[in-house]
């Protein structure tokens, strides 16, 4: 087997990280997870479960934005956990709020993908305003966090009768 250069290895790793952030392997993609949720069920919490589809969507959006902001903003300010990371209401204030949340999530996800894919981004360099974190760690955190909550969203949708295989 031919030995790869560091540049080739970094390009390969970046390509796989972008793919992991965008789609991943072992779960439903984000677009499918949020598609066709009836407006009347977006704020529904099923018995025995703590979240509505809206709460999970907004938590994913807010958390991903926060990770992105931390990854690229020297003036980053940590938000208060947990209240700043979850919506205040079980249901979106409007159908437009649901749509805007999805659009913002996708926009921030693309921004994270661009940050990772940028040839100037050193995945292993410590983020100067952090406490040892790297862009590699933050990219994996975005992918991991989103995959976890996409799974929760599917469970919630099944429980409220809003998921068809």
Residue ranges and their predicted role:
Residues 1-10, 14-27, 31-34, 39-87, ...:
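Short, contiguous alpha-helical
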């Amino acid at each position: 087997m031919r030995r790869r250069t560091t540049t080739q290895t970094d390009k390969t790793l970046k390509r796989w990280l972008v793919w992991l952030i965008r789609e991943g392997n072992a779960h439903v993609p984000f677009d499918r997870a949020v598609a066709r949720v009836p407006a009347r069920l977006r704020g529904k919490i099923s018995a025995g479960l703590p979240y509505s589809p809206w709460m999970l969507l907004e938590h994913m959006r807010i958390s991903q934005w926060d990770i992105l902001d931390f990854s690229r903003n020297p003036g980053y300010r940590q938000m208060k956990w947990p209240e700043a990371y979850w919506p205040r209401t079980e249901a979106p204030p409007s159908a437009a709020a649901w749509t805007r949340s999805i659009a913002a999530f996708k926009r921030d996800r693309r921004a994270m993908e661009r940050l990772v894919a940028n040839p100037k981004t050193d995945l292993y360099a410590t983020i100067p305003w952090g406490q040892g974190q790297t862009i590699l760690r933050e990219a994996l955190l975005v992918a991991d966090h989103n995959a976890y909550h996409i799974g929760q969203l599917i469970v919630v949708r099944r429980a409220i009768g809003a998921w068809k295989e």
